[in-house]
UniProtKB/Swiss-Prot annotation:
Pfam families to which the protein is assigned, alphabetical: Ltn1_1st (PF22958), LTN1_E3_ligase_5th (PF24618), LTN1_E3_ligase_6th (PF22999), UBC_like (PF23009), zf-RING_2 (PF13639)
Catalytic activity reported: S-ubiquitinyl-[E2 ubiquitin-conjugating enzyme]-L-cysteine + [acceptor protein]-L-lysine = [E2 ubiquitin-conjugating enzyme]-L-cysteine + N(6)-ubiquitinyl-[acceptor protein]-L-lysine
One BP term from GO: ribosome-associated ubiquitin-dependent protein catabolic process
EC number: 2.3.2.27
Domain of life: Eukaryota
Keywords for the protein's UniProt record, in alphabetical order: Cytoplasm, Metal-binding, Repeat, Transferase, Ubl conjugation pathway, Zinc, Zinc-finger
Pathway(s): Protein modification; protein ubiquitination
Zinc finger (RING-type) boundaries: 1645-1692
Predominant location category: cytoplasm
UniProt protein name: E3 ubiquitin-protein ligase listerin
PROSITE patterns linked: ZF_RING_2 (PS50089)
GO MF annotations in UniProt: ubiquitin protein ligase activity; zinc ion binding
Length: 1696
């Protein structure tokens, strides 16, 4: 259908027209389809068809219209809606009736067929559709047909209805039709009743003819409680009793209709009260008198049933249901009263019943039930009462009717008084009951009070004879008639007759006086708080002098002394009874401590004030009360009520502005602040909170933008709060201040947020500054909780927002910015700040800037000035920089980025505080954060001065960050600070983002670098690198090379830092100038900065970054050095203790060594060579410098000595690399004997010095003490990486043996292992990597020493095992414990993050390196040895531990980082596909080193020990089993499979009589074995999860082999491949050997049915003396232990 609709939309009209002849038949069928989605799609497609064919549909309308109308009444709303949309698309609204009239006969035919003829079986295919679906479709079609008939009747023009009379009469005459009223399906019943309502409206005559069927069908269904049916049913009921005049004659009302109605009413409408009960009034209004018979009985039953319905479960639970019942009850009661407003006896009985038995009991019940009190009952009672009052006082009605209603009113008021008194005149009067009484009286007094609560407009019932309230209002009232202001307001707002209101007022006052007097008795005698609250409610509603007189009289009767109390002088102005009552009673109640909450007493107070006519009198009363010692909550309630009610505010406004209240509030503020800060034993929190709430109220509430109290008192209170916060700042512990500070925050926040212009007060600005200061202090400094600091932040931000936004600008006279800037400046420069303190300070100031920039138009200039005022002077910046620790210098010095020839010993010994941050870091980071914030707001800096200051700030920040970065092992404090600053946006990246708007920053950094060098040069280098500045951008600064001479440290460091970014021409010019100056340098200036040292350092720097300059420069410089060797040999530190030399000489020698290293790099990449003299100088100097470095090891704590040692090792490394990489053709151009001299003397000399030096340093220094040795160890390691295996085996290390250590190695080799292996435990990465590379050179040779030992493992050994090198295994045992302690809390399968270069990192790294060596050793062993080694690993369970640990160290996604993401088709590189390069100095990828190494070890383990891994995997628990399988299959199996297949393809191993081929696509290896006439083909299939899964062996071709033998051989190969730790080729070789032995006549072992044992590869040798059969020793051992017998497995005789 959807495709058809789309086709109709897209195709041409002529094409679509072709469908029309077939469409009616298709539509009529599928519009009734079972699937609602099909029906909806059909209507949507029909719409598209209509839009396309338009008028051409007309010929087909009659065949479509019946089903179309049914579709418009579909029970599935989207389908019905789509059908109606299609209908509207076909016909405009005014044409639709005509279209229906045109097709009415056809429509009626379809509808009548569906209603009278069709059945479930005729509508659907009985063979294809289940019975449930058939019935569902039938019920839906009947429902839709009934609704379609209703729609037809309603839409047809009235003139056309007559033409359907006959068809409708026929329908109504059918019994089947009337059965639909009792149908079990609710939708059919609902549709039936809707049709009945439509027939009553459109064709009443037809229905009258069938009244005998209609009336019982409708009226006797009145108790149907189905929610679907009920609305349609009651509509049909009302239409029926209205349309059919004699309807009651066709039903038995007394036995049928009314009992059912009573039942529905008693059950509260059965959950449908909102539907049923609004229909009750029109229903009973149509019940004739002959049905009612006895009105008293009828109305008693009716209202009793309604009353019971109020108690039903649904009515109690649902306010809406309850409201519907109440409304119906009162409407029907008014109707019944109107119908029986006569003086006959029967009428009087009904009136009596309605008043006494119905209305008054209902009111009485409501006073006990809060649900009824919240219902519309009281308002309905009031409306009923008003209608009676109007009739009683109306001049237009006859006297009899007025007299009757007057009697009704009198009876009502008498009964009401009796009910109210019965509820009040009780000792234990219920609080809910009294609230109900007061609520009812309040509604009767002021009907408008409910309108405020419920503003929803409701329809009102107006009975016949009742006029509109507004039209009946009497406009002329006698002026002499006394009338209260309250009555006038009530009448004017409701439009009611004031005369009637006055009459009710009198009756109400009588009742209120009676109840008040009664309450007073209980208050006085019983001290009843409930009665007191009731009295307060009465007086609040009825603030009348008369009521107070009654109360006063009652008080005087009880205790005449109350009126003449000596405490209060009742002067003539207190003749007012209300005032007398205040002093006689109310004051004592306020002082009564048993009355915890006194808010209701405040209502009485306002009633007293209402009765006072003079404002001065009211002020005097309140002032008098203020001087009394009342609870502060009393004044809180007084002011709260004044703020919520304008009338009450007018009564208390003079008092609020007065001095009496103001002074009391100042005293309150002082007491609260003093007690809260000084006394830990503060009053209860609730009591204090009331006091603080009072302060907050008077400071925050305002009327017409004025404070509630006088401005002077507001400022004094703010002063008190400010003083309190200042004290809180100065107290050492603030834990007990939380409550007071929190309250002050609440008060301040309300004050700042609510009053416009509040910060014009100086005290308010001081308060704001103090809160700002508290917020800027970290919680560990201020000792305040995070929640309180958050509240402080919100408070001061509210104040700042008020300061900015309400003025649209910062006020000119504001001191807040100046004071805050000075305070922040003092904090960052003089205070000791930790990370948290600095973060709090930065965040708080940042909040200040953000708020002002977002709110103020001129915020930028204000904050620029603010930032400038916080900036230190140039001298202060200089002092702060000098205060930074010089530890930073060691790292760039040793890495060769800076050169020094002066004292640098302090770089390692000078320490700095570990608990607070340097002031330079704090100042620079805060100021730069603010500067960057300003740049974000306004990119272009119009004022040059602002730009200069921002550049200085950012430059200092970059300097500080560079200092942090250059620290080799910074304290934790510095690392945390850098992370914090990065999270706040104080970083290089942020500066780079905004560097375009800082054009002067590069020049500033360059100038600082040239002036001071050192760290400024590194800062400039980092900035240029991050910014990506090219040579062209630097050219304006660097083009004049003359300004670098004479060379200073500043110019030297600048060149060294910028050399990588300078253009080649500039570097060439610098090198030429320095070379020329070097050649003419005097002897005295050789070691000076502006001499040999400086020139050589510049040359090294430029040549190191540009090799194109080397060819011409290097020979010349080398000649200069040779001349120095001849003329000034003492400047060369050869074979001496460097510690005794000057710093300048050490620096010079370092630069000479670096130059020679550059020379060697150049020689290795070019065809040039040197002459004998040059090589002699280089080689001899290198060895002499190395000897000096070794002799000076005790002075390595001095940076320049350490640098000298590193440079010497690096030179040795470059020489070793050169000779290793020299090509054969190049060797011929080298001087004669140079290579032999290198191999026989120089290289031997290097490593005879280096290897012992490494061991000595490692033994003398613990890892924690070698922080200054790190670079030396790295350089040593790089040098030792070039040692050959022969030189390593011929080492000169002292002998080292371990007692009891079993070994087959030579003494020299064992000593080497015992010396180097423990260094894998060393807590320095470079040592571990160096030792690994050294041991890896010899690992493959070690298994050869165990080959001889194989003979000692005879057949008598039950489970032979052989340990890998004992030195490695002892180290591994220690490492296992260490790693276990690190990883024990991490479950297998979870990735453990190991922090680089920490202690744990070294433990894990050493553990993995040790295993890598063991696996290398294992791979190099023969098959027989591997079996013994694997047996040892199985016994010690070391391999199991390794595998568990690997699955904690390998990442979940081992993808190599840094790959391009724009190549999705290419397989990503992983840690398994890429080799790990373990470089000694490599720190770029150290973050990934442990995960990558773990993956490498796992890869090696799977490759070399597949059987053992498979065994471990099968023994794992289910979760780990799945984790291992999933990970291995996804990342490792494909790599190993391809490697295994490749190894088979590339194998050079040749088998006699067997050929092996491999297929990589199918992961198969095919082996073909041929001997004599026998031909065997075996297909080896690798599993998807290789090597975890079992390798399958399938049979190919076989010729000349018995089936049983064939099966045995396949089983043997499968066993070898599954259980042997080796490759497929090794397994095939073992299998072939086994088959060969079989053909040679060697018998199979009768236990494993194999000639060669699968583990130790032995032949069957143990023979039974009885049956002579031979067995493998290991097989026999397993047989004996598993069977617990010592008999032969075959003959069962005792085995000897």
């Amino acid at each position: 259908m959807q495709e058809f609709g789309f086709m109709c939309k897209e195709r041409e009209m002529e094409t679509v027209r072709g469908v029309l002849p077939y469409w009616p038949r298709i539509y009529c069928k599928i519009s009734l389809d079972l699937d609602r989605r099909v029906r909806e799609a059909t209507q949507q497609a029909f719409e598209q068809l209509i839009l396309k064919v338009k008028k051409y549909l007309a010929p087909h309308l009659k065949s479509l219209m019946g089903f179309w109308l049914i579709a418009q009444c579909d029970t599935y709303s989207p389908a019905a809606s789509s059908a109606r949309v299609a209908f509207e698309a076909a016909f405009p609204a005014h044409k639709q009736p005509e279209a229906l009239a045109f097709c009415k006969e056809e429509i009626m035919n379809v509808l009548l067929d569906h209603l009278l003829k069709e059945t479930p079986d005729t509508l659907s295919d009985t063979q294809a559709v289940p019975i449930e679906d058939r019935e569902s479709k039938y019920f839906r079609v009947v429902t839709c047909s009934l609704l379609a008939l209703k729609r037809l009747l309603c839409m047809l023009p009235r003139s056309e209805n007559s033409s359907l009379q006959e068809r409708l009469a026929h329908l109504l005459s059918q019994s089947k039709f009337w059965k639909y009223s009792k149908h079990s399906t609710s939708s059919i019943r609902s549709a039936f009743f809707e049709l009945m309502s439509a027939l009553c409206q459109c064709s009443p005559d037809v229905l009258r003819a069938e009244a005998s069927r209609l009336c019982p069908a409708v009226l006797l269904s009145i108790d149907d409680s189905d929610a679907v049916v009920c609305p349609a049913l009651w509509e049909a009921v009302l239409y029926t009793i209205t349309t059919i005049e004699d309807c009651w004659e066709h039903v038995n009302a007394q036995k049928g209709v009314l009992p059912k109605l009573w039942s529905v009413l008693r059950e509260g409408g059965r959950g449908l009260a909102t539907v049923i009960f609004p229909n009750l009034l029109p229903f009973i209004s149509r019940v004739p008198t002959n049905i009612i018979k006895t009105p008293t009985d009828f109305y008693s039953n009716f209202f009793n049933s309604l009353g019971q319905g109020l108690s039903s479960e649904r009515a109690v639970a649902s306010p809406a249901e309850c409201s519907a019942i109440i409304s119906a009850y009162m409407e029907c009661l008014r109707f019944a009263m109107q119908e029986n407003a006569g003086e006959e006896e029967e009428n009087k009985k009904v009136q009596q019943i309605l008043i006494s038995d119905q209305l008054m009991p209902l009111i009485d019940s409501s006073l006990k039930d809060p649900k009824l009190q919240n219902s519309p009952l009281f308002s309905q009672v009031e409306e009923t009462l008003y209608s009676w009052e109007k009739k009683a006082e109306s001049q237009g009605l006859d006297d009899k009717l007025s007299r009757i209603h007057a009697t009704l009113l009198r009876e009502f008021w008498e009964n009401l008084a009796h009910i109210c008194v019965s509820h009040v005149d009780v000792i234990e009067a219920g609080e809910k009951n009294l609230a109900g009484v007061s609520g009812l009286l309040q509604v009767l007094q002021n009907p408008n009070c409910l309108l405020k609560v419920n503003k929803k407009k409701k329809a009102k019932i107006r009975f016949k004879g009742e006029g509109d309230d507004e039209s009946d209002a009497v406009s002329h009232v006698s002026e002499s008639q006394p009338m209260s202001k309250f009555i006038m307001e009530t009448c004017s707002s409701s439009g009611r007759d004031p005369g009637i209101a006055q009459l009710r007022q009198e009756r109400l006052e009588d009742l209120v006086c009676k109840l008040a007097e009664l309450s007073m008795v209980y208050i006085s005698e019983q001290r009843s708080q409930q009665h007191l609250m009731f009295l307060a409610a009465l007086l609040s509603t009825f603030p009348s002098i008369r009521v107070f007189q009654v109360l006063l009289q009652q008080s005087s009767e009880e205790d005449p002394k109350n009126l003449n109390s000596p405490d209060h002088d009742v002067t003539p102005r207190h003749k007012n009874p209300a005032v007398q009552f205040l002093y006689a009673k109310l004051i004592f109640w306020f002082n009564d401590k048993s009355l915890e909450e006194s808010d209701f007493l405040v209502d009485i107070l306002y009633s007293v004030l209402f009765c006072c006519t003079d404002s001065s009198e009211r002020k005097h009363l309140l002032d008098d009360m203020t001087k009394m010692n009342f609870k502060w909550s009393v004044f809180l309630y007084i002011i709260q009520k004044a703020c919520t009610d304008p009338e009450k505010y007018s009564l208390a406004s003079d008092w609020l502005k007065g001095e009496v209240l103001g002074e009391r509030l100042i005293c309150l503020a002082n007491d609260l602040c003093t007690s809260g800060l000084m006394d830990k034993a503060t009053p209860s929190e609730a009591y204090c909170s009331k006091k603080w709430a009072l302060l907050s109220l008077v400071l925050s509430e305002h009327v017409h933008n004025e404070y509630l109290i006088a401005d002077a008192y507001v400022e004094k209170i703010i002063n008190k709060l400010h003083s309190a916060l200042m004290k809180a700042r100065n107290l050492s512990k603030a834990g007990h201040l939380e409550q007071s500070v929190s309250f002050i925050c609440d008060v301040g926040s309300n004050f700042f947020s609510s009053i416009k212009g509040c910060l014009q007060m100086p005290s308010a600005e001081d308060l704001l500054l103090t809160i700002f200061q508290l917020c800027a202090q970290a919680s560990d400094t201020s000792h305040m909780s995070e929640s309180l600091l958050l509240k402080l932040k919100n408070t001061w931000l509210a104040g700042l927002h008020s300061l900015v936004c309400q003025y649209k600008n910062m006020p000119q006279g504001s001191n807040f910015l100046k004071q805050s800037a000075q305070w922040v400046k003092d904090q960052i420069q003089t205070s000791h700040l930790n990370v948290k303190s600095l973060q709090s300070l930065i965040c708080t100031v940042d909040d200040l800037y953000s708020t002002i920039l977002d709110s103020s138009l001129s915020g930028f200039s204000l904050l620029a000035e603010h930032t400038a005022s916080m900036m230190p002077s140039a001298e202060t910046w200089q002092k702060m920089r000098h205060a930074l620790s010089s530890q930073w210098l060691s790292k760039p010095l040793l890495e060769g980025r800076l050169s020094m020839n002066t004292e640098t010993s302090g770089t390692d010994l000078k320490s700095f505080p570990k608990t607070w941050l340097p002031s330079h870091l704090c100042t620079a980071s805060l100021l730069s954060k603010m500067a960057l914030r300003l740049l974000e707001k306004e990119k272009s800096l119009k004022e040059e001065e602002i730009g200069v200051k921002i550049n200085i700030t950012v430059a200092e920040m970059l300097y500080s960050l560079q200092w942090c970065e250059e620290l080799e092992k910074p304290p934790t404090l510095i690392g945390e600070c850098c992370e914090m600053l990065c999270s706040l946006g104080v970083s290089h990246e942020k500066v780079m983002d905004l560097s375009v708007h800082l054009p002067g920053l590069l020049e500033l950094l360059y100038n600082r670098s040239k002036e001071d060098g050192s760290l400024w040069s590194l800062t400039a280098n980092r900035f240029i690198h991050k910014r990506g500045a090219g040579p062209s951008e630097l050219l304006p600064l660097t083009e004049d090379t003359e300004k670098y001479f004479p060379v200073t440290l500043g110019s030297l460091h600048t060149i060294q830092s910028l050399s990588a970014f300078l253009c080649p021409e500039l570097k060439e010019e610098l090198v030429i100038q320095c070379t020329a100056r070097l050649m003419t340098c005097s002897a005295s200036a050789v070691s000076c900065t502006d001499g040999g040292f400086g020139y050589l350092a510049i040359i090294n720097s430029c040549l190191g970054s540009d090799s194109d300059l080397c060819q011409e420069i290097l020979p010349g410089v080398l000649k200069v050095m040779l001349s120095w060797k001849d003329d000034q040999e003492d400047i060369f530190l050869f074979s001496s203790n460097v510690q005794d030399s000057s710093q300048s000489l050490i620096g010079l020698n370092v630069e000479m060594i670096r130059f020679l290293s550059i020379l060697l790099k150049y020689l290795a990449s070019s065809v040039s060579s040197l002459v004998d003299v040059d090589w002699d100088f280089i080689m001899c100097s290198m060895l002499a410098w190395l000897e000096s470095a070794c002799e000076s090891s005790a002075a390595y704590h001095i940076p320049l000595v350490r640098l000298f040692a590193c440079a010497s090792c690096d030179l040795a490394t470059e020489i070793s690399h050169y000779f290793e990489s020299v090509a054969t053709s190049t060797t011929m151009s080298l001087p004669a004997n140079l290579m032999s001299e290198w191999k026989e003397f120089f290289s031997e000399g290097i490593y005879s010095l280096m290897l012992p030096m490494l061991v000595r340093i490692a033994e003398e220094y613990k890892a924690s003490e070698t922080s200054h040795m790190s670079h030396v160890l790295k350089s040593l390691g790089r040098t030792l990486g070039y040692i050959s295996k022969e030189q390593l085996l011929n080492h000169k290390l002292p002998a080292k043996f371990v007692a009891g250590q079993k070994t087959n190695l030579t003494d020299s080799l064992q000593s080497l292992l015992n010396t180097l292996a423990p260094l894998l435990l060393y807590r320095e990465r470079s040592v571990q990597i160096t030792v690994y590379h050294l041991l890896d050179k010899i690992m493959a040779d070690l298994p050869g020493f165990d080959d001889e030992d194989l003979k000692s493992y005879g057949d008598e050994d039950e489970e032979p095992a052989l340990s890998p090198p004992a030195a490695l295994m002892s180290v591994l045992a220690i490492q296992e414990d260490l790693v276990e302690s690190i990883l024990k809390e991490i479950p297998v399968g979870e990735f453990a993050v190991i922090e680089p270069l920490k202690e744990e990192f070294c433990f894990v790294l050493g553990y993995l390196l040790t295993w890598k060596l063991i696996l290398t050793f294992f791979k190099a062993a023969s098959s027989q040895l591997r079996a013994l080694y694997s047996q040892y690993l199985r016994k010690t369970k070391s391999l199991n531990k390794l595998l568990y640990n690997l699955f904690k160290l390998m990442p979940h996604n081992p993808v190599l980082p840094g790959q391009a993401s724009d190549m999705p088709s290419k397989e990503p590189k992983t840690f398994f596909t890429e080799e790990l390069q373990l470089a000694v100095k490599g720190t770029a990828t150290v973050q990934q080193e442990v995960p990558h190494l773990a993956c490498c070890v796992y890869h090696m383990t799977l490759k070399d020990l597949p059987a053992m891994v498979r065994l471990w995997w099968n023994g794992c628990e289910k979760r780990i089993f799945n984790v291992v399988d999933r990970f291995t299959t996804k990342y490792v199996s494909s790599v190993l499979s391809s490697q295994e297949i490749s190894s088979v393809q590339l194998s050079t191993q040749v088998f006699d009589g067997m050929t092996v081929k491999a297929r990589s696509t199918t992961r198969e290896v095919i082996a073909t074995y041929s001997v004599d006439d026998i031909c065997i083909e075996l297909i080896i299939q690798l599993p998807q999860n290789y090597p975890l899964g079992s390798i399958t062996v399938e049979s190919g071709r076989r010729v000349g082999v018995a089936v049983q033998q064939w099966r045995n051989w396949m089983l043997q190969l499968n066993t070898y491949l599954t259980h042997q730790n080796g490759s497929i080729m090794e397994g095939l070789a073992l299998w072939k050997n086994n088959v060969d032995k079989r053909f040679e006549g060697v018998e199979d072992c009768m236990i494993c049915f194999s000639v060669i044992h699968g583990s130790n590869y032995s032949l069957p040798k143990k023979a039974c003396r009885t049956c002579k059969k031979k067995f493998h020793s290991e097989c026999l051992y397993k047989w004996f232990t598993s069977s617990n017998k010592s008999t032969c497995p075959l003959c069962r005789e005792t085995f000897f």
